[in-house]
């Protein structure tokens, strides 16, 4: 009877050695050798979390904030400042390589349109993409304006 319980439990739970998550927002890394389901759908998770299938383990993880991580040129790594977007203030996102994550202002998709030379006063209407309404991006150096993005 004990043998049946062990064999049957292993068959139901499954086993895996270090599954890596491939889904956006799912935490990377190795997971326990015993597979388990702590959630079956997003409805099983608290508000602000979603059910993430890591390949072997279903767990509730914080939903990522909107926007994309900027291109990052990092100085030497000094450890994580954040583990996920919820660790960052406001609309900042947790970005970077594992072990070197920092909070950054997010970017919206698309790129800024090419500009012709503009003379006149240097006025800054935005500081980053999320200062702009809708899908507009913060573009230029001087002046900095909210503009409709180009999509390649």
From Swiss-Prot:
Membrane-spanning intervals of the chain: none
SMART domains given in the database record: WAP (SM00217)
Subcellular location(s) of the protein: Secreted
Expression across tissues: Component of the acid-soluble and acid-insoluble organic matrix of prismatic shell layers (at protein level).
Cysteines joined through disulfide linkages: 26-52, 35-56, 39-51, 45-60, 69-95, 77-100, 82-94, 88-103, 112-139, 122-142, 126-138, 132-146
UniProt keyword annotation of Disulfide bond present: yes
Keywords for this protein: Disulfide bond, Repeat, Secreted, Signal
GO molecular function, one term: serine-type endopeptidase inhibitor activity
Gene3D superfamilies linked to this entry: Elafin-like
Major localization listed first in the record, in broad terms: secreted
Keyword Magnesium: no
InterPro entries the UniProt entry points to: Elafin-like_sf, WAP_dom, WAP_four-disulfide_core
Descriptive protein name: Perlwapin
Species name: Haliotis asinina
Taxonomic lineage of the native organism: Eukaryota, Metazoa, Spiralia, Lophotrochozoa, Mollusca
């Amino acid at each position: 009877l004990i043998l049946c319980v062990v064999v049957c439990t292993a068959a139901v739970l499954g086993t895996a050695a270090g599954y890596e998550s491939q889904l956006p927002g799912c935490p990377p890394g190795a997971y326990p050798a015993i597979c388990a389901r702590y959630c079956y759908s997003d409805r099983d998770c608290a508000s602000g979390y979603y059910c993430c299938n890591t390949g072997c383990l279903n767990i509730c993880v914080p939903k990522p904030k909107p926007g994309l991580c900027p291109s990052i040129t990092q100085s030497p790594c000094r450890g994580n400042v954040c583990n996920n977007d919820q660790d960052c203030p406001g609309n900042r996102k947790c970005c970077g390589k594992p072990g070197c994550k920092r909070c950054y202002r997010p970017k919206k998709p698309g790129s800024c349109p090419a500009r012709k030379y503009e003379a006149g006063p240097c006025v800054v209407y935005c500081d980053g993409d999320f200062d702009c309404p809708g899908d507009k991006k913060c573009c230029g150096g001087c002046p900095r304006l909210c503009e409709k993005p180009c999509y390649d």
